Amino acid sequence: MDSDFVPPSVSFQLPVIDFSDQNLKPGSSKWDEVKADVLKALEDYGCFEAFFDKLSVELNRSVFEAMEDLFELPIPTKQRNVSSKPFHGYLCHNLYESLGIDDANVLEKVNDFTQQLWPDHGNKSISETIHLFSEQLVELDLMVRRMIMESFGIENYIDEHLNSTYYLTRLMKYTSPPDDDDDDEETKLGLRSHTDKNIITILHQYQVDGLEVKTKDDKWIKVKPSQDSVLVMVGDSLCALLNGRLHSPYHRVIMTGKKTRYSTGLFSIPKTGVIIDSPEELVDKEHPRIFKPFEYTDFLHFFQTEAGRIAQSALHAFAAF
């Protein structure tokens, strides 16, 4: 487990990459230009800030308002958001509270979610808002993953890879720390430092900052994406798939001030039964195979164990040769 109590440096501007160009199509010169920027940013930081104009001001406002309504529901109501999968469904710990929706890019799935919370009538407005937002983030995720696989010369696996994943949309609320705990670093932790276990994560924070990312030289930096952009981040499963060519960065949420923080996350996740294994094209004398093939659910179950929680790198502890 990584240390949470290292003072962060000053705010830092991660690379900003624009995905809004209408000519951004596979095979175009603009695509190749953006693809090179994506690879450089992920090699350097494991993440980057993405501007994507399909996430309009109006859509962002609607998502923010939907989250306020959802988290105002009584706890027993929110606890109806259940899942048999680890780290899915409703979660609550200290300052952190979260709701999870599988396949929120499919409207029927979001309707099922709101029907859990409002059994009599669902909530059409919230369903449509979350569905549209998830759809747009999925479009961005697919572009990023296609660019990554092209960059490493494994484009023959693109369709197989994209079809082997599904999406989890997570709505997150971080409560401000109590007034009498201003000097207590433990109570300021909205979310402990961790690497994400999935393929790609896309995060968007609303109005209140708090996200920090650890660089490869072990420095914590405050990340402050604009309200018009999102943070795209490599997860452990992508690191394993690429035989360690990219790294998944540690990140955490530190809460200061008196405002509640809301954020959203879209997580691309390997489907049940899919084996994560590096293609032969990424294994050679200079890059020997680092990880054993594994199934994502087994990895999550390991992460829930004491050994998984205390490991400096759960991925290496679980799957490294």
Swiss-Prot record:
SUPFAM superfamilies: Clavaminate synthase-like. Gene3D superfamilies: B-lactam Antibiotic, Isopenicillin N Synthase, Chain. Residues 165-270 form the Fe2OG dioxygenase domain. Pfam families: 2OG-FeII_Oxy, DIOX_N. GO terms for molecular function: dioxygenase activity; metal ion binding. Binds 1 Fe(2+) ion per subunit. InterPro entries: DIOX_N, IPNS-like_FE2OG_OXY, IPNS-like_sf, Iron_ascorbate_oxido_reductase, Oxoglu/Fe-dep_dioxygenase_dom. The keyword Metal-binding applies. Its EC number is 1.14.11.-. The keyword Oxidoreductase applies. It comes from the Eukaryota. Its cofactor is Fe(2+). 2-oxoglutarate binds at R261. Fe cation binds at H194, D196, H251. Keywords: Dioxygenase, Iron, Metal-binding, Oxidoreductase. Probable 2-oxoglutarate-dependent dioxygenase that may be involved in glucosinolates biosynthesis. May play a role in the production of aliphatic glucosinolates. Belongs to the iron/ascorbate-dependent oxidoreductase family. This is Probable 2-oxoglutarate-dependent dioxygenase AOP1.2. It comes from Arabidopsis thaliana (Mouse-ear cress). The gene is AOP1.2.
